[in-house]
Design a protein with these regions (language model features):
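Small/polar residue-rich beta-strand/coil "junction" motifs that cap repeat-based extracellular fibers
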Residues: 30-42, 46-55, 59-65, 78, ...
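Detector for intrinsically disordered, low-structure N-terminal pre-sequences
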Residues: 9-12, 28, 76, 80, ...
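Gram-negative bacterial Sec-dependent N-terminal signal peptides
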Residues: 1-30
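Surface-exposed, glycine- and small/polar-enriched segments that build interaction surfaces at terminal
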Residues: 65, 71, 84-86, 93, ...
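Short hydrophobic/aromatic beta-strand element in the GNAT-like acyltransferase core
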Residues: 60, 74, 102, 145, ...
């Protein structure tokens, strides 16, 4: 009696086809080394890497040594990346996205607020919700804060800090420019090293400073240190304030080029 035997390769393919067909409605894949195996526990999960883990009930992805995708629709890519929030994404070595829909991209990036986004090495988007930190070591600390630039710090509620080492540390403060600093509530600082210290103060220009409440300083190195004071430019130091006048009294002058300046009243009277 003659018997025909199928090649081993055909048998292996047939077995693989049977296994795929048997698990078509429940797809889970886990691969790792012989020493530390990956663990895929959800019905639709992809887990690649030593000690990588996926949890939740569906659509989780963990790729990298000790990567973890903890809840539904979470994605973790990179060594020790941790996407622990529902629908979160964590990409980069030791990156963390620990809140719902949080997004972390970069080495040590950390997005801990709901719908927060952290992009850059050691960028941190905290608060409870809707924070954005973009740049190496950028920090958005409270709700709805936005920090963009290396070491930018938006520490106030709803604050915005854009520029390298810029700071917006009060509620709704706005800082734009390298080393710009808005520390007064609802203050605005625009320009390199511009400083808005008073509440609702405005400083526009490199090294400008608005220190008083409601004060405005416009121009490079312009300084408005009193409440409700307005200073335009640097050389002439044209000033305006609602406070009563004291000390030396000046008048505003303008030349043929349209340049503003100030002159002491006594000097003006003698010049006449």
């Amino acid at each position: 009696m003659k018997m025909d035997f199928l090649p081993k390769s055909v048998l292996k393919i047939s077995a693989l086809t049977f296994a795929i067909a048997a698990t078509a409605s429940c797809t889970a894949m886990a691969t790792g080394t012989d020493h530390q195996t990956a663990n895929a526990t959800s019905s639709t999960a992809i887990t690649l890497g030593n000690a990588a883990t996926t949890s939740g009930t569906n659509d989780t992805v963990a790729i990298g040594s000790q990567a973890n995708a903890g809840l539904n629709s979470a994605t973790a890519v990179g060594g020790q990346a941790n996407a622990a929030g529902l629908g979160s994404t964590s990409i980069g070595w030791q990156s963390k996205a620990t809140a719902e829909r949080a997004q972390a991209f970069g080495h040590l990036a950390n997005a801990s607020g709901v719908r927060s986004t952290a992009v850059g090495e050691a960028a941190m988007a905290g608060g409870n919700n809707d924070t954005v930190a973009v740049g190496n070591k950028a920090n958005a600390g409270l709700n709805s804060a936005t920090a963009v630039g290396g070491e930018a710090n938006a520490a106030g509620l709803g604050s915005t800090s854009i520029g390298w080492q810029s700071k917006a540390t009060a509620e709704r403060a706005q800082a734009f420019g390298h080393l710009a600093n808005a520390s007064g509530m609802r203050s605005t600082a625009v320009g390199e090293a511009a400083m808005a210290k008073g509440a609702t103060s405005v400083a526009v220009g490199n090294k400008s400073m608005a220190g008083g409440m409601n004060s405005i300083a416009i121009g490079n190195e312009a300084k408005a240190s009193k409440d409700n004071q307005v200073v335009l430019g640097n050389a002439g130091q044209v000033q305006s304030s609602t406070a009563a006048q004291s000390g030396t009294v000046r008048i505003v002058t303008i030349d043929d080029n349209g340049t503003l300046g100030t002159m002491m009243v006594d000097y003006y009277q003698k010049a006449k």
